Amino acid sequence: MIALIDKYFPDLTRPQRGQFEALYALYADWNTKINVISRKDFDQLYLRHVLHSLSIAKVCPFAPGARVLDVGCGGGFPSVPLAILFPEAHFTAVDSIGKKIKVVQGVAEGLGLANLDRKSTRLNSSHNRESRMPSSA
């Protein structure tokens, strides 16, 4: 499965490869508790969710120190894959549904992503000054 990511992002470091490989098991575990990815779609996780999330990186790479706000992050797409790809940028994943943020938190902790914050709030109550990035919301 990592071969699909490698095809488009051949310069991944060993730790990044490990994090991308670990995504499947982490999301599989969380998805049994909180359905954030369609069960019929889950086998296509890397193509339909991870690679799709990373597509923005080809046209908008995030510089070291960049701060990115993902509003309506759902289960962590695109925040989680982008936080892996850009470890020097800082991401904040926001969703109004607490159980989705719980998934993002569990996945981020499982991957050791120190550059990804999570917030369960509504946009109109969030006063972040971070850049917004396109999201599935």
What are these regions (language model features)?
Residues 123-137:
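Single conserved hydrophobic/aromatic residue that forms the stacking wall/gate
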Residues 24, 54-57, 137:
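Short, amphipathic alpha-helical segments that act as regulatory/interfacial helices
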Residues 54-122, 129:
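Conserved SAM/SAH cofactor-binding pocket of Class I
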Residues 20, 46-49, 73-75:
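Generic structural signal for well-ordered secondary structure
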